[in-house]
Amino acid sequence: MTIKRKKVSVIGAGFTGATTAFLLAQKELADVVLVDIPQLENPTKGKALDMLEASPVQGFDANIIGTSDYADTADSDVVIITAGIARKPGMSRDDLVATNSKIMKSVTKEIAKHSPDTIIIVLTNPVDAMTYSVFKEAGFPKERVIGQSGVLDTARFRTFIAQELNLSVKDITGFVLGGHGDDMVPLVRYSYAGGIPLETLISKERLDAIVERTRKGGGEIVNLLGNGSAYYAPAASLVEMTEAILKDQRRVLPAIAYLEGEYGYRDLYLGVPVILGGNGIEKVIELELREEEKMALDRSVESVRNVMEILS
């Protein structure tokens, strides 16, 4: 008898894609299909086999295959896109637009063909614009095309807060709004340590420094690595979102969602709090923003639109 499990396809078998595939399998969330270009089919198969051979040791039951044939992804419950060129030191996210938008269109055509009912999560940078590109190419309802940045940016923010206070990261909550770039908006006012507002625990000077470090978080890792970009935390963030969808958890998470008037913006993808469940984005949550917070979000939106103009 064949075991019927959920199915997740991960497009792009680089560091982030492969790590995502392994974490998905370890958590037994789904069978995993890891996909890359034909020239990299054997290395992709090798990575998948290596992961599968870890299953007896790690104690998980999940099938993992590597392939370059999108037919193997057919009827995926979730498809995660990590494919694209990597960000290099000194490279702005804007520099990635031309090449990665072409990759998105090519990949999305295959996804829509083989898994017309799937939910797509996009990681490829610049992720706000790439998610919009995938949305337009796929022709899916907006709820089923989602970008990942807020979970990652918020994780970085929570990490730095926990370090500052010498507390468990489990006790730190927070939200980061806006585009995935230097103009993102960590909302200190909606962030807490064990239910206590951060503003009562950390000085404004230190909070400002933590906010700035969060904004530069991706670049900090790029510069430290010297080659490539972060992949452990991005992969973990993708898995958290995927789990919320597959298990219909209706989690309140920050995600890149298509806006149609929420927060006063239209026809763009932007990082906002959402309810994430079995149908994808179940609802966009609108927070009340102070004037300075709304102005910061306006600046972030302007940055996102500037990148989107390159697409058009």
UniProtKB/Swiss-Prot annotation:
Residues holding substrate: 87, 93, 125, 156
EC number per UniProt: 1.1.1.37
BP terms from Gene Ontology: lactate metabolic process; tricarboxylic acid cycle
Superkingdom classification of source: Bacteria
InterPro entries for the chain: L-lactate/malate_DH (IPR001557), Lactate/malate_DH_C (IPR022383), Lactate/malate_DH_N (IPR001236), Lactate_DH/Glyco_Ohase_4_C (IPR015955), Malate_DH_type3 (IPR011275), NAD(P)-bd_dom_sf (IPR036291)
Residues that coordinate or bind NAD(+): 12-17, 36, 100, 123-125
Catalytic activity, reaction form: (S)-malate + NAD(+) = oxaloacetate + NADH + H(+)
Active site location: 180 (proton acceptor)
Pfam families, alphabetized: Ldh_1_C (PF02866), Ldh_1_N (PF00056)
Annotated keywords: NAD, Oxidoreductase, Phosphoprotein, Tricarboxylic acid cycle
One Gene Ontology MF term: L-lactate dehydrogenase activity
Family: Belongs to the LDH/MDH superfamily. MDH type 3 family.
Listed NCBIfam families: MalateDH_bact, PRK06223.1
Biological role: Catalyzes the reversible oxidation of malate to oxaloacetate.
Protein name: Malate dehydrogenase
Gene: mdh
